[in-house]
């Protein structure tokens, strides 16, 4: 039922939330913060505003927004942190009225759990952040979320037990970062100062986990802030609850705790709390009755445990025996099946051998009966013919085997020879290129220095040559024409050399292609071993070659299919004309690699 006299600002916000799309809802809900901040704290007007917010399901909208992924919310962590403040302030001091059961049993635990989940997400983002400014901003948002959770727990103490038992809270407490860890431990200290009685109402496992984490941070963290907070937490737990103090004294899990605390530095800021904690954990005179009780309790637990294990083992004995019998029978049946199969195979082999012997005996009897019909003078001739036929068959098989063996050996050696030639050709070509590069890029070494005697001798030879071959004087115009002719011939030479190099490269490419084709033909399988795709490897990649091959194939077919009287007078070198229509049949179906479709 909607309350009367609702604040018009709440009505307008609720109407905007109902009409706006989902992505705009978080920004609209932030308007509630302005309304709450300008209203005096503790006034009846603020209480009425909180009731209106709850009645129009704006708190539920805040919960739904906080349960979404932070990356999808407009404004990111800034919007989320402000929504946590709005949610905590609205839930504290609210009188739900008729929906009190739903509010206390569902909404408040869900809000506390959402705050813890947001804390874990902020912790993960803080750890993954690389920049210091981003870390400071995330730490500020984390502090806002923890403050909102503490504000909510301060107004609803019954939620402390749920928070302490939550796995998310334990994960936050196990943070290795100094800032996150100190913030969580300060929140735990403030929670225990509000109501430490809930610490004994939580499960044994959760209590041990909290104690283990606090003690671990006390001894393993070098940060004095975390160590001071951990010491204060342990002191607060031990002073508030005698059960926890007894647990820290007598439990085997915390054996040697006092000795480790005594070794801590005494000049620190928390040395006073440390001394108080050591004093609480100092050994006292334990009564023999308590030790005897503990011993009897341990013996009783062991007896019950051993009895339970024995009864459990006895219950499993029949099933174990049944399983053993089943496995034994299955193995025995498999063994019998194997023995029967072996016997059947042996019987089959024996029957085949007997049939073979029987057939051989019948064939020999038939031969003897046929020999009885033959004239006695022809028997020796028959035996001689049989021996010759047998010898010929043996020789034929032996020669075939020898030729096949020699062929395979020669084929392998020929392949190796071709490979060696190819490698040598490639190596020689590579060395020639290297020598050519060295000649092109070789530095100028200058001329060898001449001796005085050699210089005089050369000068004398030049003077003699000039004296014997007096040249006619050449004009400047003739000299220039001669120079132009020389340049033209030099240019013609260089252009011809480029064409010769291209022709040489083309010849080398053709030789390499021919070598590849020869090697491919040598490696070609026999007709019996050939598969469907292997003949496609021998199709030419050149259209003229493919057309010429098609023409030769059709010529051969026409020559074979022609009647005998048409072949009279033909010579082996004569060519047969093939129509172009027949030549173009299926030519487009040939695989021509390296070409583009028209």
Curated annotation (Swiss-Prot):
Q: In which tissues is it expressed?
A: Ubiquitously expressed in fetal and adult tissues. Localized to the outer segments and connecting cilia of photoreceptor cells. Up-regulated in a number of primary colorectal and gastric tumors.
Instruction: Return any one Pfam family short name.
Output: IQ
Q: Tell me what induces its expression.
A: Down-regulated by DNA damage in a p53-dependent manner.
* All copies of domain IQ, residue ranges: 294-317, 318-338, 387-416, 417-437
| This protein's UniProt keywords | Calmodulin-binding, Ciliopathy, Cilium biogenesis/degradation, Coiled coil, Cytoplasm, Cytoskeleton, Leber congenital amaurosis, Nephronophthisis, Phosphoprotein, Repeat, Senior-Loken syndrome
Residues in coiled coil: 336-373
Which GO-annotated molecular functions does the record name? Answer: BBSome binding; calmodulin binding; enzyme binding; protein-macromolecule adaptor activity
Subcellular location(s): the record lists: Cytoplasm, Cytoskeleton, Microtubule organizing center, Centrosome; Cytoplasm, Cytoskeleton, Microtubule organizing center, Centrosome, Centriole
**Gene Ontology terms describing biological process:** cilium assembly; cytosolic ciliogenesis; maintenance of animal organ identity; photoreceptor cell maintenance
Q: Which domain of life is it from?
A: Eukaryota
Q: What is its main location?
A: cytoplasm
InterPro entries, alphabetically? ARM-type_fold, IQ_motif_EF-hand-BS, IQCB1, P-loop_NTPase
- Statement: the UniProt record of this protein carries the keyword Signal: no
Q: How does it assemble?
A: Interacts with CEP290/NPHP6; IQCB1/NPHP5 and CEP290 are proposed to form a functional NPHP5-6 module/NPHP6; localized to the centrosome. Interacts with calmodulin, ATXN10. Interacts with NPHP1, INVS, NPHP4 and RPGRIP1L; these interactions likely require additional interactors. Associates with the BBSome complex; interacts with BBS1, BBS2, BBS4, BBS5, BBS7, BBS8 and BBS9.
Q: What does this protein do?
A: Involved in ciliogenesis. The function in an early step in cilia formation depends on its association with CEP290/NPHP6. Involved in regulation of the BBSome complex integrity, specifically for presence of BBS2 and BBS5 in the complex, and in ciliary targeting of selected BBSome cargos. May play a role in controlling entry of the BBSome complex to cilia possibly implicating CEP290/NPHP6.
Q: Do you know which PANTHER family this protein is assigned to? A: IQ CALMODULIN-BINDING MOTIF CONTAINING PROTEIN 1, IQ CALMODULIN-BINDING MOTIF-CONTAINING PROTEIN 1
Protein name (database record): IQ calmodulin-binding motif-containing protein 1
Which species expresses this protein natively? Homo sapiens (Human)
């Amino acid at each position: 039922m909607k309350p009367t006299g609702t604040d018009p600002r709440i009505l307008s916000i609720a109407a905007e939330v109902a009409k706006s799309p989902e992505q705009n809802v978080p920004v609209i809900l932030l308007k509630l913060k302005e309304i709450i901040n300008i209203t005096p704290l503790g006034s009846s007007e603020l209480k009425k505003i909180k009731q209106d917010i709850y009645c129009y399901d704006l708190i539920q909208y805040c919960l739904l927004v906080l349960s979404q992924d932070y990356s999808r919310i407009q404004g990111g962590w800034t919007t989320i942190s402000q929504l946590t403040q709005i949610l905590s302030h609205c839930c504290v001091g609210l009188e739900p009225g008729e929906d009190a059961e739903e509010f206390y049993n569902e909404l408040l635990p869900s809000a506390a759990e959402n705050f813890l989940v947001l804390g874990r997400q902020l912790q993960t983002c803080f750890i993954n952040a690389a920049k210091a400014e981003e870390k400071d901003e995330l730490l500020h948002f984390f502090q806002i979320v923890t403050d909102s959770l503490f504000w909510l727990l301060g107004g609803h103490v019954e939620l402390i037990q749920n928070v302490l038992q939550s796995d998310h809270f334990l994960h936050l407490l196990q943070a290795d970062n100094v800032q996150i860890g100190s913030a969580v431990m300060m929140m735990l200290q403030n929670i225990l100062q509000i109501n430490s009685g809930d610490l004994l109402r939580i499960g044994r496992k959760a209590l041990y986990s909290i104690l283990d984490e606090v003690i671990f941070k006390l001894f393993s963290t070098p940060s004095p802030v975390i160590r001071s907070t951990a010491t204060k937490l342990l002191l607060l737990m031990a002073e508030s609850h005698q059960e926890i103090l007894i647990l820290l004294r007598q439990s085997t899990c915390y054996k040697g705790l006092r000795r480790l605390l005594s070794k801590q530095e005494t000049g620190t800021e928390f040395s006073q709390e440390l001394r108080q904690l050591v004093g609480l954990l100092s050994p006292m005179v334990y009564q023999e009755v308590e030790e005897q009780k503990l011993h009897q309790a341990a013996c009783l637990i062991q007896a019950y445990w051993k009895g339970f294990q024995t009864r459990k083992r006895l219950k499993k004995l029949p099933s174990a025996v049944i399983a053993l019998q089943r496995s034994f029978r299955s193995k025995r049946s498999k063994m019998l099946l194997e023995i029967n199969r072996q016997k059947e195979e042996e019987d089959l082999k024996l029957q085949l051998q007997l049939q073979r012997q029987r057939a051989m005996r019948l064939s020999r009897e038939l031969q003897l009966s046929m020999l009885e019909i033959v004239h006695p003078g022809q028997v020796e001739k028959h035996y001689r013919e049989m021996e010759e036929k047998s010898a010929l068959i043996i020789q034929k098989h032996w020669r075939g085997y020898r030729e096949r063996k020699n062929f395979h050996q020669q084929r392998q050696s020929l392949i190796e020879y071709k490979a060696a030639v190819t490698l040598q050709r490639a190596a020689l070509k590579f060395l020639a290129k290297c020598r050519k590069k060295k000649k092109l890029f070789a530095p100028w070494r200058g001329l060898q220095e001449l001796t005085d005697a050699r210089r005089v001798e050369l000068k004398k030879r030049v003077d003699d040559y000039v004296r014997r071959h007096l040249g006619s004087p050449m004009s400047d115009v003739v000299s220039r024409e001669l120079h132009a002719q020389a340049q033209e011939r030099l240019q013609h030479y260089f252009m011809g050399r480029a064409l010769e190099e291209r022709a040489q490269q083309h010849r080398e490419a053709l030789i390499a292609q021919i070598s590849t084709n020869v090697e491919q033909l040598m490696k070609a399988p026999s007709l019996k071993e050939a598969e469907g795709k292997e003949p496609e490897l021998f199709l030419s990649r050149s259209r003229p070659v493919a057309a010429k091959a098609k023409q030769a194939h059709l010529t051969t077919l026409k020559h074979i299919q022609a009647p005998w009287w048409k072949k009279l007078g033909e010579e082996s070198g004569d060519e047969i004309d093939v129509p172009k229509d027949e030549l173009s049949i299926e030519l487009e179906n040939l695989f021509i690699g390296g070409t583009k479709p028209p």
